[in-house]
Amino acid sequence: MNSKNYHQKKRFGQHWLVNKKILEKIKEIAVLNENDFILEIGPGKGALTSKLLDSEIKKLHAIELDKDLINLLNDKFNNNDKFSLQQGDILSVNLDSINKKITKVIANIPYNITGPILDIFIGRLGIIRNYNYEKIIFLMQKDVVDRILSKEGSPNAGALSIRIQLLSKIKRICDVPPSSFSPPPKVFSSLVVFEPIKNDLRLDISLEKYIDKLLRISFNSRRKMLRNTLNSILSNEEINELSESSKVCFNLRPQDISIHQWIKLAENCIKIKKKI
């Protein structure tokens, strides 16, 4: 298939990056080397794929959902030994055979699957990862990135920002206007680099699970004060003890609590529960 004859499908949320400066920037921040095994999600017509394959990398494995693009991509790159292609949905495809080989993940994420993509590649609190990615480069909706990077006291602060910041180091490289895509989306995007925190440097898994529990309970009623959300799992006496031991005011709302304070709350909550 000739790429000029292909028309994007709305159901796949296809907005292809056409800004050459941003394409070059992605290659630059990836800092590719001869040992890199790259996973590219949704290569589209292969604009970024071409740039990545021009680098000194070991392998690039691309996963594309759109069957009509598979032949196009194979025709374009089938003579390149470093390239392999798999047709499938990234939300359900089995990566077990290559997951431990992958060093870097690169993707222009469809906005409608951002949450599940983050769960798969950044991970979840309380769950050990079966991979060890060095770097994840995502081009994603700016509003979501604003939420992920938000600190306590911000109206954007939420369970998502705390979970992601506990699991990875995050850096926003730049914001990307709609005009950089074809067709242009209705919103701005951001180019972001995640560096997942290695399993052996993460918090204790049981502690992560308890933090996740507190976040889920608290942010389900984010307008309520902490005292009125945690009373579903703690008595008034326990709440007072936890507030004092953690040096956290329970008249605050969950978005006003720092990551360090959430860790202290979970640690001390576990200690209090062990007394019972």
Curated annotation (Swiss-Prot):
One Pfam entry name: RrnaAD
Assigned GO CC terms: cytosol
Compartments in which it is found: Cytoplasm
Highest taxon, organism lineage: Bacteria
InterPro entries (alphabetical): KsgA/Erm (IPR001737), rRNA_Ade_diMease-like_C (IPR023165), rRNA_Ade_Mease_Trfase_CS (IPR020596), rRNA_Ade_methylase_Trfase_N (IPR020598), rRNA_adenine_dimethylase (IPR011530), SAM-dependent_MTases_sf (IPR029063)
Binding sites annotated in the UniProt record for S-adenosyl-L-methionine: H15, L17, G42, E64, D89, N108
Main location: cytoplasm
Entry-linked PROSITE patterns: RRNA_A_DIMETH, SAM_RNA_A_N6_MT
Keyword set, alphabetical order: Cytoplasm, Methyltransferase, RNA-binding, rRNA processing, S-adenosyl-L-methionine, Transferase
Record's keyword annotation contains Iron: no
Membrane-spanning intervals of the chain: none
Single GO MF annotation: RNA binding
Catalytic activity: adenosine(1518)/adenosine(1519) in 16S rRNA + 4 S-adenosyl-L-methionine = N(6)-dimethyladenosine(1518)/N(6)-dimethyladenosine(1519) in 16S rRNA + 4 S-adenosyl-L-homocysteine + 4 H(+)
Keyword RNA-binding: yes
EC number: 2.1.1.182
Primary role: Specifically dimethylates two adjacent adenosines (A1518 and A1519) in the loop of a conserved hairpin near the 3'-end of 16S rRNA in the 30S particle. May play a critical role in biogenesis of 30S subunits.
Family: Belongs to the class I-like SAM-binding methyltransferase superfamily. rRNA adenine N(6)-methyltransferase family. RsmA subfamily.
Name of the featured protein: Ribosomal RNA small subunit methyltransferase A
